[in-house]
């Protein structure tokens, strides 16, 4: 009998012997041919597809994934006759969670000046190392990255936390526990924080004294003190009567958002003897009600939020206290007499404990420097307080040579002691006639009265004092400098006690291709700084730098170049002279491989808020890169009148008249772009803005009426500043009763009929605690009443950032731009 045996090839085709084998081989050949044909058609079909399908719901989440490279994608460009085929960064990749470069490194300073680099999204460090002060060599420090940021001052305990409830931009509620540290190892035993096992803790602060491990915390809006970390039942309640509308040690919405830019309102003294804290009384403040829609309730839920608006009589009432831990005594520190008569209409801008100079020994060893401001925020007062009394150190009005401006809380946030007084930032007239924020040395006499004895700065605004070391007499501060898109740390040696003219060293000059610094800080001793150099489309570089000798620098991270899986857009920085007399600064992205003679649309992304800055020489936002790369358009950001870094000559144009100079300069910048860059298609120009930028976008649409700007995208805009909060609005506009016309001019609602010849998109979250949906509700109603065609997106349960709906928002914005605004006869989506 003949066997019907057959062999099976490794390739997967069976080959039979005899007639059956011939038939089988024929079938196999036909099958392979069919597969090849299908493959060829699949490739052709793939390249004929539009870049993205915004109608599909792929469930992408914007997360901070790993470092694996994005896969390069070759797509047919939107305007194919203008561009060569190139590798593109797509909408799907934008929300893939994958990262193509490292833009930030986390670190901490220890109280002795040692540097410790933290775990981050890209590196897992089981063994933490530190670089001690005066050394360049890393040594073992701690074996647990989870707790290293939470060590007690004596490093014998640490806390762990788990977020339970998100509150506002900077605040949340947590479950805390304490662990013990033995030989730099975490114990298994834990102790809870709070009166009960699962108490929600709103803030936690270790005693900063190097030999201490006691702490204070905030629970249910009251402040507690605990001496022994292992005995939660021994905690002492320092305040009573705390509630949502009467907070101790925890900022209310207004202070968290507009004054402190943090939820923290507790300050330990360096010795650990004193604790100062603020009380925020909103019981008489008007409320807003934020809606929440759920499946659990057939009725709408409303959250009640105290929110003082511009011009209201009852603003937040703030009171300051000092607790003396030795005498267990709490005293209230009174505001300056000039403010006491204002019936609580004042602000506490910042607090900083300092060791008193030797000639002020009668004032005690430590005093709290408090910076107070009147309600209009154009007059500040520096007081020195302890548990016995307060003395006025300095009063400073923001009026120089009949010119007036506001104080920004961030300007005075960096207060540092010297041997004879303290340093802060205040405005000062420069040799060029402009008025800039400079470092001021306030020298104190034996009574605590101060006077400014020295100014340090050049022809640009100082942003923040980072540190000062009396030991080496060296000052460090951050500033934008006088270049376009720059941000650097500056070092001043022989800063206080030399008769020589002070000279400034720009730290970024020490590094190649480093014009903009990200995070920058000085160690607690003021003798070393950490800077993070941001270079466009490359990994950020992390440096540890010696203040005395900047050649002694260590690059800790960022030595490898980023691998970018798409063709990098071209990036331009520059300035253009405007009719207003100032130089408008800009950053512009254009597609890679842009052909000569090409004409492409322009999207101008604006913010423009007072004292803000948008132009930086660093990697743009991922959204900006994607929209340029995928759709072959130009994207720009600008800094014009009203923005920060260049003194009063630029800023003061918007004081008490928001929405005027910024709009004029923005339109003039667009004209200058058209005249300067031949690739811009003047018939396809769009402006987009969020928050204050949304306000300016609407103002531009009203003023321009489609002459230059064909499309406007306004996201979460202010439409009438009487709807916005008191602290921000009155800082720039003053009181409505004193500047009624200034407020009237910010109201876009009566001008809805002028939004003509422009395609308009409006988006807003209904649960926006910052810029209330009331703004867009009134604005859209006016547009409807005037018969204006526009597109509106309303996001239920979303706050100001729309963070949970960005996939949808960006998709709709891009659909609006490409299908409605930049519509072309070429290769439409």
Swiss-Prot record:
SUPFAM superfamilies: alpha/beta-Hydrolases, DPP6 N-terminal domain-like. The chain crosses the membrane at residues 28-48. One of its GO terms (biological process) is proteolysis. It comes from the Eukaryota. Its EC number is 3.4.14.-. Glycans are attached at residues 61, 66, 183, 209, 314, 359, 754. GO terms for cellular component: plasma membrane. Pfam families: DPPIV_N (PF00930), Peptidase_S9 (PF00326). It is found in: Cell membrane. Disulfide bonds join 514-533, 711-821. The keyword Cell membrane applies. Residues 1-27 are cytoplasmic. Its main location: membrane. Residues 49-829 are extracellular. Keywords: Aminopeptidase, Cell membrane, Disulfide bond, Glycoprotein, Hydrolase, Membrane, Protease, Serine protease, Signal-anchor, Transmembrane, Transmembrane helix. It is an enzyme of class 3 (hydrolase). The keyword Chaperone does not apply. The active site is at residues 691, 768, 800. One of its GO terms (molecular function) is dipeptidyl-peptidase activity. InterPro entries: AB_hydrolase_fold, Peptidase_S9_cat, Peptidase_S9B_N, Serine_Prot_S9B/DPPIV. It is a single-pass type II membrane protein. Removes N-terminal dipeptides sequentially from polypeptides. Essential for control of distal tip cell migration. Belongs to the peptidase S9B family. DPPIV subfamily. This is Dipeptidyl peptidase family member 2. It comes from Caenorhabditis elegans. The gene is dpf-2.
């Amino acid at each position: 009998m003949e066997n019907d045996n057959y062999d099976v090839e490794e390739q997967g085709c069976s080959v039979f012997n005899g007639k059956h084998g011939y038939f089988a081989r024929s079938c196999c050949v036909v099958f392979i041919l069919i597969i090849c044909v299908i493959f060829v058609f699949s490739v052709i079909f793939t390249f004929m597809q539009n870049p993205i399908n915004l109608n599909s719901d792929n469930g992408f989440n914007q997360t901070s994934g790993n470092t694996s490279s994005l896969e390069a994608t070759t797509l047919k460009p939107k305007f194919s006759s203008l561009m060569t085929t190139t590798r593109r960064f797509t909408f799907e990749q934008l929300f893939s969670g994958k990262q193509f470069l490292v833009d930030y490194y986390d670190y901490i300073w220890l109280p002795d000046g040692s540097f410790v680099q933290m775990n981050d999204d890209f590196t897992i460090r089981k063994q933490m190392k530190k670089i001690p002060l005066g050394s360049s060599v890393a040594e073992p420090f701690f074996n647990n990255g989870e707790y290293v940021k939470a060590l007690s001052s004596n490093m014998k305990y640490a806390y762990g936390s788990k977020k339970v409830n998100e509150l506002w931009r900077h605040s949340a509620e947590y479950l805390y526990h304490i662990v013990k540290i033995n030989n730099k190892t975490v114990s298994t035993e834990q102790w809870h924080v709070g009166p009960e096992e699962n108490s929600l803790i709103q803030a936690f602060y270790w005693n900063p004294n190097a030999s201490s491990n006691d702490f204070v915390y905030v629970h249910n809006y009251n402040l507690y003190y605990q001496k022994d970390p292992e005995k939660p039942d021994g905690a002492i309640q320092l305040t009573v009567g705390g509630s949502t509308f009467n907070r101790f040690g925890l900022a209310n919405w207004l202070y968290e958002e507009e004054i402190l830019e943090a939820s923290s309102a507790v300050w330990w003294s360096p010795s650990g003897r004193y604790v100062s804290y603020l009380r925020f009384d909103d019981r008489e403040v008007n409320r807003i009600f934020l809606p929440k829609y759920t499946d659990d309730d057939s009725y709408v839920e409303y959250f009640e939020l105290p929110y003082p608006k511009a011009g209201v009589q009852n603003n937040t009432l703030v009171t300051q206290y000092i607790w003396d831990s030795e005498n267990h005594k709490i005293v209230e520190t009174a505001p300056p007499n000039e403010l006491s008569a204002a019936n609580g209409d004042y602000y506490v801008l910042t607090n900083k404990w300092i060791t008193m100079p030797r000639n002020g020994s009668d004032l005690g060893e430590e005093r709290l420097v408090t910076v107070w401001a009147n309600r209009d925020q154009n007059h500040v007062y520096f007081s020195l307080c302890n548990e016995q009394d307060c003395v006025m150190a300095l009063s400073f009005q923001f009026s120089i040579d009949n010119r007036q401006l506001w104080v920004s809380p961030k300007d005075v946030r960096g207060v540092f002691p010297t041997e004879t007084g303290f340093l802060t930032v205040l405005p000062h007239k420069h040799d060029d006639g402009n008025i800039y924020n400079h470092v001021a040395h306030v020298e104190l006499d034996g009574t605590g009265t101060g006077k400014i004895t020295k100014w340090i700065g050049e022809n640009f605004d100082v942003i923040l004092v980072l540190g000062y070391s009396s030991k080496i007499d060296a000052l460090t501060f951050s500033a934008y400098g006088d270049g376009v898109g720059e941000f650097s740390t500056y070092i001043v040696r022989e800063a206080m006690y030399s008769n020589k003219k002070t000279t400034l060293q720009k730290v970024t000059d020490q590094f190649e291709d480093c014009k903009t610094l990200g995070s920058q800080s000085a160690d607690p001793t003021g003798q070393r700084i950490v800077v993070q150099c941001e270079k466009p489309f490359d990994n950020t570089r992390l440096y540890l730098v010696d203040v005395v000798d900047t050649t002694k620098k260590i690059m800790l991270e960022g030595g490898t170049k980023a691998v970018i899986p798409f063709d990098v857009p071209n990036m331009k920085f520059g300035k253009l002279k405007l009719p207003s007399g100032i130089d408008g600064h800009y950053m512009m992205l254009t597609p890679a491989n842009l052909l000569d003679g090409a004409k492409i649309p322009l999207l101008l992304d604006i913010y423009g808020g007072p004292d803000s800055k948008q132009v930086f020489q660093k990697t743009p936002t991922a959204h900006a890169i994607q929209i340029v790369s995928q759709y072959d358009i130009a994207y720009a950001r600008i800094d014009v009148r009203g923005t920060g870094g260049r003194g009063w000559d630029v800023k003061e144009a918007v004081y008490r008249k928001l929405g005027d100079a910024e709009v004029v300069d923005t339109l003039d910048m667009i004209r200058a772009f058209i005249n300067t860059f031949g690739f811009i298609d003047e018939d396809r120009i769009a402006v987009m803005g969020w928050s204050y930028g949304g306000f300016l976008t609407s103002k531009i649409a009203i003023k321009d009426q489609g002459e230059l700007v064909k499309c406007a995208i306004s996201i979460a805009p202010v439409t009438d500043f009487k709807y916005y909060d008191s602290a921000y609005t009155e800082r720039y506009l003053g009181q409505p009763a004193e500047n009624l016309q200034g407020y009237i001019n910010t109201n876009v609602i009566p001008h809805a009929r002028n939004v003509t010849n422009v395609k308009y998109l409006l988006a807003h979250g209904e649960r926006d605690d910052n810029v209330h949906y009331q703004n867009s509700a009134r604005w859209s109603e006016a547009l409807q009443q005037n018969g204006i065609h526009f597109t509106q997106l309303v996001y239920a349960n979303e706050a100001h950032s729309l963070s949970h709906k960005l996939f949808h928002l960006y998709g709709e914005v891009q659909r609006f731009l490409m299908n409605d605004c930049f519509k072309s006869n070429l290769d439409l989506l």
